[in-house]
């Protein structure tokens, strides 16, 4: 109680009770736990719609989408371009994949992260989770979300509108920027 904003970074489905509490009590959430959206899905979306409590994504790609949508109507969106670095194996031939080690997977070419998210990123599992998170956080059908491999990680994501305009958020690959924005 009395919080101006809560940074939610609880892993797994355990994030849902705190997410629900914050929203029902009008406490804005800086969402660093994609699990609240992935596990919560339609329930989390309904809470957001019912309470109208602000949810600000901390993840760089989701923060970029949030920024590109500011002042615009989600119904005007043609598609969301969700970027991915492609991870450390993006240029590997299929034959090379059998020799991948955990140590190799933990050497992300762009970001410095914890072990779980680094492995999830190396296998593109993290991008699958981000597709689900994007779907529920922005209330947009998954068919309107396109993953684009962008190894430089300068374009954090973009939104293409039905009128042909594309808005993108660009910046250095530095997590301090989306954290500060939230």
Whereabouts are the PLM-identified features?
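Catalytic, metal-anchored helix/loop core of enzyme active sites in primary metabolism
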Residues: 1-182
């Amino acid at each position: 109680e009395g919080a101006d904003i809560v940074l939610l970074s609880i892993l797994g489905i355990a994030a849902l009770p705190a997410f629900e509490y914050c929203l029902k009590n009008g406490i804005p959430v800086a969402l660093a736990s994609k699990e609240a959206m992935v596990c919560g899905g339609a329930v989390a979306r309904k809470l957001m719609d019912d309470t109208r409590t602000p949810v600000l994504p901390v993840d760089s790609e989701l923060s970029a989408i949030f920024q590109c949508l500011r002042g615009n109507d989600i119904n005007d969106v043609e598609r969301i371009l969700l970027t991915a670095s492609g991870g450390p194996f993006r240029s590997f031939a299929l034959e090379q994949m059998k020799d991948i080690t955990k140590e190799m997977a933990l050497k992300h070419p762009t970001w410095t992260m914890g072990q779980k998210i680094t492995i999830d990123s190396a296998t593109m599992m993290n991008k699958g989770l981000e597709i689900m998170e994007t779907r529920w956080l922005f209330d947009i059908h998954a068919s309107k979300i396109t993953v684009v491999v962008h190894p430089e990680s300068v374009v954090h994501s973009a939104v293409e509108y039905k009128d042909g305009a594309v808005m993108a958020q660009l910046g250095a690959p530095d997590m301090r920027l989306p954290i500060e924005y939230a």
